[in-house]
Amino acid sequence: MNTEKIGNVVMNYDYYIGQDLYSDGDIEDILLDIVKNHDKSEFPNIIVESKSWPILYHLSEVRTNILNWYPFESDAHVLEVGAGCGAITGAIADKAEKVVAIDLSKRRSMINAYRNRDKENIEIIVGNFNDVAAGLTEKFDYVTLIGVLEYGELYIPGNDSYRTFLKKIAGLLKPNGKVLIAIENQLGLKYFAGCREDHVGKYFEGIEGYTTTNSVKTFSKKVLKEIIEGSGYENIQFAYPYPDYKLPTTIYTDDFLPVKGELVNNLRNFDADRMVFFDETKVWDTMIEAGLFHEFSNSFFVEATKPGEDAKRSEQTGQMTSFAKCSVERKDEYKIITRIFEEDGKKFVEKRAVNEKACGHVNRMAELAKTNPYLTENVCLVPCEAVADGVVQFPYIEGQRLDKAIDEAVKQGRLEDAWTEIRRLKDIIMNVSGKEKFQVTDEFRTVFGQIPQPEPAEGEKQAEPVDPLAVLEGYEAVKNVNMDMVAANIIFADKTYILDYEWNFDFAIPLKYILFRSILFNGTLNVMPEEQRKTLMELIEISDEEWQLFLQMETSWQQFVTGTSLTDLYPDMPSKYTIVKEENYCNNPPEPKCSIPYRAARKVKRMIVAALQKDK
């Protein structure tokens, strides 16, 4: 057996032909140097400094979000096909007993090994998938195809490549084993909105049916399901990574779909320039209202089961995840995953630390729940139980969410009802017990006080430094107050429940700032016409000056928690976007000679209409 060890990782060269048939070029040498000579904790700073899409793509922890929420059994054996540079390998190894990773490239496999060299449960086999599959004797609980199925014609040439490929995968699974697939949606909304097709870099190539492309292909939901069913799998479950599967932050399912105003993070074209034909957030809202999100989701995550009678039992068997939010764009001590799942007919919410450093942050929620601090008899925190170190669990509460009550009232023009609900929100926040007069402390300033001094006007001298937080002295404040007391986290059932209380500090926070956050994070209230907005501000008794100060405090806090996020990185990346203005694609352009943006936009309009008609 031709093997070597890199750290604890076993490299298997039995199927390696002596040369790499696939390479991304010089960037692989750069990546190998980084993972050899730098700890993973240094990767975020390297990404920020590089301003490079390949480095971001291969080293960002956000990549792991496609699987770090998935409830692998702790004794599972997982085969990862097309492991590449190992962006996801380590996340699987953290959950499963054993990972066997296959990749065609020795160089990419070495990057994988060096970045995961501390893990003792990874074997990397370098070689062609068909050769490796023919030689494998072990059967696996899971096989992952993350960004792999679309290359099925390269793995298995022929007229029915994708079904043949999936049938070969089934041969590597135990009875009742599962294949996990992540793939772009051929009809993803981003392609209509002006993004290039991910694999070939051409506008409209996928949604026009890959008329000029062979060797790589993505599929609509309907076609993908037919391919998987036709390969002999059953119990096919779809999930919808947002914004896409490559850098996802949220996983939706048919049991838990996004609501209007939620899908706002759409400029993610780090890898290539794009056009912007329309406001994707507004179109997403239309799709959500029409019940079409699942058809136009930018990516799919699919779980499909190989039939069999020998399903093994474990601590996770029977759980069905309906939603996951992966909060890894944070400092290590705050990284968590929130998951909604069903087990034995009951729904639960789980919050789990991503690493040991974040365990204390999660455990604090269970400690806080025991005391139900500063709330009244009829307003309480949803119960919380610590089920393991760094893992807490809540019952899933059904009832009327306050944010939906507000949104529906505004949408239906029932403004007096909306104001009534906002008064109720204000009362819940402002009438907690344990109030004290606010004083600025060093702890408070560390989190909320990193506010830059205003720049002097041209020709003027820099004014004496002022403390922008000083105006808050004497405000009503509370220690350990729940920072997440926004309308979306307040639900009316047998009592008024606060659903989320991840964020609280042991120093006093002004209650007006909590009220500000409840308005800031409600999309409906933020887009009100000016006159209604004025009434709203009078109702919550927050002045324009206070609003601006609270915005700066919010920015300071987010920076304290996250450092530099992907959204922060976007302006510094080489890829750009071009907004196609309305006058360029109106129905009756003034000039008979159409511009390229106009022609493109007309094409998009026709495609969307055709797709919607086909869906019907």
What are these regions (language model features)?
Residues 1-38:
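N-terminal auxiliary segments of SAM/dcSAM-dependent transferases
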Residues 85-96:
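Conserved SAM-binding loop of SAM-dependent methyltransferases across substrates and taxa
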Residues 160-178:
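A short glycine-rich, Lys/Arg-flanked "PGG" loop and its adjoining helix->strand segment in the class I
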Residues 180-203:
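Conserved class I S-adenosyl-L-methionine
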Residues 209-210, 468-528:
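Catalytic activation segment of kinase domains across protein kinase-like and atypical kinase folds
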Residues 325-370:
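ATP-binding glycine-rich loop module of kinase domains
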Residues 381-456, 460:
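Conserved structural core of kinase catalytic domains
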Residues 499-586:
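C-lobe/activation-segment region of protein kinase-like
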